[in-house]
Amino acid sequence: MRPVLPQKKINYKLLILYGLIFVICILGIGMSMYMQYFQDEKIGVIFGITDSEDEDLYNELKNNFSSLFTNDLDNSQGKDLEVKKIKEDFDIVATRHTYKEEQENYTLDVSIPIININNEEIKTYNQEIEDTYKQKVDEIKASSGYIYNVRYKCYIQDNILSLVIYSELKEKTSNQKIMIETFNYNLAENKEVTLEEILNLKNIKVSDANSKIKNEIKEIQEKNDSLTELGYNMYKRDVDSDIYEVPNIEQYFIGKDGNVYVIFAYGNYDQTSEMDVVIFMNK
């Protein structure tokens, strides 16, 4: 008589577990293949989340950059700052000189700021502002054929004071120049702040910042190259220049809502109004 073996019970829990593992593997492989062939797509789109609103806001901030300069202070920290002022009845940043003249030989619309903090480093910077902008006003008044506009904006975010000075200069028949100067100062530590320190404060890696800047500059130059081929006279950027590396960037500031602005004002050293603005939006 042939022995009868007992029937094994089917382990449905184990089958379900294997099935789930199989499905997860298939999804993982599918996602990897998708990212391989569509790596330029945003991950948010894959999950039904788009960044179109952020992109619209980003472009709006860039397009409205020149309208920021209203000759005043935007202090997001309220009155919780303790600084030793030069003049107690003035704000931390105020207008030191104002020139609004329209003469036959020149036109001036100039507001020159002063940082109202009593320490040696700030005094040195205030003197630089005086030497740069007031001296230019004096030169223009003794000359002819000039249009000179100077405006500023100051922000205080995270104990960092950021002063930005925007100037436009039209000399006779030459092209207009647009120039930007910035000054960033840690009010709590009484020292100037580097761009790298600001990026660290915002948890932005320097390598990521470099990549973003390079990509945006490259995209702008590619568009300019296309327009140049059509016969337009476009400003040429050297996309491989080290001026686009974080350690070498001179003009930057923390603006409204904690957004970090990086500015390449080519008029600072060329006869041009061309300027690039790269913004790291605060999340």
List each language-model region with its residue ranges.
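Compositionally biased intrinsically disordered regions enriched in Thr/Gly
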Residues: 2-6, 10-22, 27-283
